[in-house]
Amino acid sequence: MANRGGRHARTEETENAINYVQCDGLAVMKMVKHCHEESNNMDLAQGALLGLVVDKCLEITNCFPFPKSGDETMDEEMYQLTVMRRLRRVNVDHLHVGWYQSSDVGNSLSLALLESQYHYQTSIEESVVVVYDTQKSSRGFLCLKAYRLTPQAIQMYKDGDFTPEAFRNLKVGYESLFAEIPIVIKNSPLTNIMMSELNELLPEDKGHNFLDLGTASVLENHMRSLIERVDELYQEAVRYNKYQQVVFKQDTEKHRALAKLAAENAVRTSKGEPTVSEEEVIKQFRPMPVPARLTATITSGQINTHAQHIAQFCSQSLAKLFITESLQNAKEAKEIK
Amino acid sequence: MQAEFKLRSKILLQPLVLLHIIDAYERRPKDCTQVIGTLLGRNNPESGHLEISNCFTLLHKDYPNSDRIDVDLQYANDMYELNQLTYPQEKIIGWYATGKEVSRSAVNLHEYYARECADGNPMHLLIDTSLRGQRMMMRLYTAVVMGVPNGTKGLMFSLLPVEMSSGNPESVALNLMKKNALQPTKQVGRILPELVQVVDITRDLQTKLDLVLRYVNETLARKRTPNNTVGRALHDALTSVPLVDAESFRMMFNANVRDMLMSITLATMIKAQLKISESVIAMPDL
């Protein structure tokens, strides 16, 4: 119960900055275009988000892509500044409110993402990272997620202390590294008018491929990456266990040495000789470095999202299967007649 | 020139461009009545058609009732070069403007873009943002030279056929926005969970089936004159459901359901494990 209360207090803390993200259709479409174009080249797409903060809502009104990372000659900061300055002249919001990245399921919440987001959030407090899942979206489910680091995660990264104690003191767990912020897509009335015009022009059958029944390959992919992550976590667990064993062994040795010393000291005092202080002995046993918990925590977070995705995916697949069943039943009933 | 456009039978327009133009229009400077900008495009590798895939807004100053227009050309060049860095395959193919009709400055702009365009044949996209006739008109023009040979010549902007193009992922996003535009509900713009999406589409399907059913019943009751095309289309739809024999369908169905349930169980178990392991590690030293 205490844990739950603690988490509640934590969400309130994050709410102080931003409650939800409101994304313009234009920015969504730009991200979709960029991410899919890069995913055709098997590249990771990244870009900057532009917008403004109104009360507790972060509005993303525009975005622009970062150039391909292969080009080393270019100054990325310079590029960003130039683009923003240019866009400002046509009255685009020029507040840099975060960045976006294409990714496939679950793997997005990586150490690299944590690092970049840390730098963003320390320089611009309100910034978010938007993760766009290309795989899922090309199967018919628009998948945009906005994340922010929780205040504890920032504190932890700032301290650079990844020991289990530090994690415990800050109450950081795999669920409280990143906070997901709900995204809302909103268009201006004029855009909505245009959308209803488009309604007549666009083919009806596009974009409904999420009713596809071929689920085995998708599930297989999910499972494969889940297994990889679990393996990683296992490695981390093994490392931690080893550490615990070593510490335990050291402890027993220390106790033995101390007991020996106490006995010797007792003999010495009875003989009236000066005693040897315990510190001498303790010094011989250097404390073991504690393995960092950061990787394990991040991997746990990834596994958690994978598991969530799988559960979601399966539930909708089951729904589709039952739809097909009723179709089949109707067909069979007709045959019998 | 004209022959070229005939070969290029279809021009595809990405919805992103329209969204961009409307955004630009809404953000225009106070004293401006219209926005103009450069259209960028490329050849769609799948269909071979020319596709208008991107655009950027230009800084300009227009003078009503004259054909004079001042455009910041330096800005246009800079924007094009910046775009080249991220989308190197996109080339200048024309310009867009908002307004009721082709403006008087179009001839001047045409001259400029004819120089910038790779094939010397720029296109002009016109969007009526003033919503005349309760519609938002979108038209694509190309300028055709007309006049007397060796005599006075002029430019005529003639219409080009244009079609909306959107890849699958774009349609997914568009569908969602369309739904919001057409039926504003309380949860505006929320990205729905997958299961809800499937439920929604099932409901859609049901209403469509009801519609068809009503039509069929009315036709059978001689209340409606039968229509052969509709009948054939219905027949096609009915026969498109493949008949799988009961045995193999059961097999497939059961295997799939088993897989799914198994996966859900596994996923839940892993989640529980994670929780436990974290709690154990976070346990204070005794």
UniProtKB/Swiss-Prot annotation, chain A:
GO cellular component: eukaryotic 43S preinitiation complex; eukaryotic 48S preinitiation complex; eukaryotic translation initiation factor 3 complex
Superkingdom classification of source: Eukaryota
HAMAP family tied to this protein: eIF3h (MF_03007)
Protein family membership: Belongs to the eIF-3 subunit H family.
Transmembrane regions listed in the UniProt entry: none
CDD domains for the chain: MPN_eIF3h
Compartmental location: Cytoplasm
Gene designation per UniProt: eIF-3p40
Gene Ontology terms for molecular function: metallopeptidase activity; translation initiation factor activity
A biological-process GO annotation: positive regulation of Notch signaling pathway
Residue ranges annotated for the MPN domain, each copy included: 21-153
Keyword DNA-binding carried by entry: no
UniProt entry keywords in alphabetical sequence: Cytoplasm, Initiation factor, Protein biosynthesis
Pfam family, one: eIF3h_C
Primary role: Component of the eukaryotic translation initiation factor 3 (eIF-3) complex, which is involved in protein synthesis of a specialized repertoire of mRNAs and, together with other initiation factors, stimulates binding of mRNA and methionyl-tRNAi to the 40S ribosome. The eIF-3 complex specifically targets and initiates translation of a subset of mRNAs involved in cell proliferation.
Top-level taxonomy: Eukaryota, Metazoa, Ecdysozoa, Arthropoda, Hexapoda
Protein name, as recorded: Eukaryotic translation initiation factor 3 subunit H
Matches recorded under InterPro entries: eIF3h (IPR027524), eIF3h_C (IPR045810), JAMM/MPN+_dom (IPR000555), JAMM_MPN+_peptidase_M67A (IPR050242), MPN (IPR037518)
PROSITE patterns: MPN
The protein's assembly and partners: Component of the eukaryotic translation initiation factor 3 (eIF-3) complex. The eIF-3 complex interacts with pix. Interacts with mxt.
Swiss-Prot record, chain B:
GO cellular component: eukaryotic 43S preinitiation complex; eukaryotic 48S preinitiation complex; eukaryotic translation initiation factor 3 complex, eIF3m
Family matches, as Pfam families: JAB, MitMem_reg
Domain MPN: 11-147
Alphabetical keyword list: Cytoplasm, Initiation factor, Protein biosynthesis
Subcellular location: Cytoplasm
Domain of life where this protein originates: Eukaryota
Family annotation (InterPro entries): eIF3f (IPR027531), EIF3F/CSN6-like_C (IPR024969), JAMM/MPN+_dom (IPR000555), MPN (IPR037518)
Gene3D superfamilies in the cross-refs: Cytidine Deaminase, domain 2 (3.40.140.10)
Subunit (UniProt): Component of the eukaryotic translation initiation factor 3 (eIF-3) complex. The eIF-3 complex interacts with pix.
Name by which UniProt lists this protein: Eukaryotic translation initiation factor 3 subunit F-2
Organism: Drosophila willistoni
